[in-house]
Structure formats: C-alpha cells, structure tokens
UniProtKB/Swiss-Prot annotation:
It comes from the Bacteria. Substrate binds at residues 9, 41, 78, 92. InterPro entries: Cyt_trans-like (IPR004821), PPAT (IPR001980), Rossmann-like_a/b/a_fold (IPR014729). GO terms for biological process: coenzyme A biosynthetic process. Its cofactor is Mg(2+). This is Phosphopantetheine adenylyltransferase. Reversibly transfers an adenylyl group from ATP to 4'-phosphopantetheine, yielding dephospho-CoA (dPCoA) and pyrophosphate. Its EC number is 2.7.7.3. Keywords: ATP-binding, Coenzyme A biosynthesis, Cytoplasm, Magnesium, Nucleotide-binding, Nucleotidyltransferase, Transferase. The record marks 17 as: Transition state stabilizer. The lineage of its organism: Bacteria, Pseudomonadati, Pseudomonadota, Alphaproteobacteria, Rhodobacterales. Pfam families: CTP_transf_like. It is found in: Cytoplasm.
Length: 171
C-alpha cells in the first residue's frame, strides 16, 4: 500500500490545498493529511476545527478517487510523522519560486534524516497559485469576500469569526 503524507497547518484549508489533496490522492492508496500543531503560528482555528474542516472537505475527494484520506495531527518532526504513519512519500504543493527555495532546504534536511522517504512536489494549478491561508484570513478579517479562495463551509467558518463581507462603497 502506497501511503503519502501531505503536511500543513491548514488554517484554514483553501481551494489550493484541496487541489493538491485531490491530485495527490491519485498517487497513493492512502493519503494522510498531517495537520501541524504549530504553536508559534498562533492559528485562527483550533486543531479540532482544522481537522474537522479537512475531514468534511476531503470526504468527497475520497469518495471520488477511492483513496482513503485521513487527517492526522502532529507536533513532531515532519520526517518522524512520515515514519509514524508509514508514509513512503511526503507531498508538497508549490505555488512560486519562493516556495521552492524553502522546500529545497527541507528536502535536503529530510533526506539526511531518512533517505527512504521521498518528497513529491505538485505545482499549484494556475488559478490557485496566489492563494495562501494567511492572505485568506487577512481578506476575511478586513471584510473582504473569500468566496473565490475557499469552499462554502470554510467561508461560513470565517464569517463566524470575522463577520460577513462588507460591501465596498465604490462598487
């Protein structure tokens, strides 16, 4: 059984994340979504909320592809998480050159720690390349409409936190 690990904070999960999840699920029999517990980032949504959002969003992808998709919180080294879940590959999404530079360093370190686990990069689809959870939260916080970047369920969660989008007087 081929097991892949797609790690991230997913605060919140975006259409870009879901695109990578959908495409990664065709490469493996089981896709583990590693939900990072990163206390330094100060997430907007709790770990439980992020896991629940991912489980809800991934159910349809799992049904569509036949791939088992599970959310798995982790707080240890990524390579240790990969070992813990039996992953033979770590899947990473790339949006831009800046992502590649960071990921290139991570691959080098992870290979030194365990060279039996490969890293597979999937380029974000063009329509998702600008999407970042950090920017989605900022748009929502400032009263903008996040509809183009997240699913309706995630949008509702953001509206619960920040209120509905404000109408721009210039429109």
């Amino acid at each position: 059984m081929r097991i892949g690990l797609y790690p991230g904070t997913f605060d919140p999960v975006t259409l870009g994340h879901l695109d990578i999840i959908r495409r990664a699920s065709t490469l493996v029999d089981r896709l583990v979504i590693g939900v990072a517990i990163n206390r330094d980032k100060g997430p907007l949504f709790s770990l439980e909320e992020r896991v629940a959002m991912l489980e809800a969003e991934c159910a349809a992808v799992s049904a569509e592809t036949g791939t088992e998709i599970v959310a798995h919180p982790f707080e240890n080294l990524l390579i240790d998480c990969a070992r813990d879940v039996g992953a033979s590959m770590i899947i990473r999404g790339l949006r831009a050159v800046a992502d590649f530079e960071y990921e290139f360093q991570m691959v080098g370190m992870n290979r030194r720690l365990d060279d039996s686990i490969e890293t597979v990069f999937l380029m974000a689809e063009a329509e998702h390349q600008a999407i970042a959870s950090k920017l989605v939260k900022e748009i929502a916080r400032l009263g903008g409409d996040v509809t183009p970047f997240v699913t309706s369920q995630v949008r509702a969660a953001l509206v619960d936190r920040f209120g509905p989008p404000q109408m721009n007087a210039a429109q």
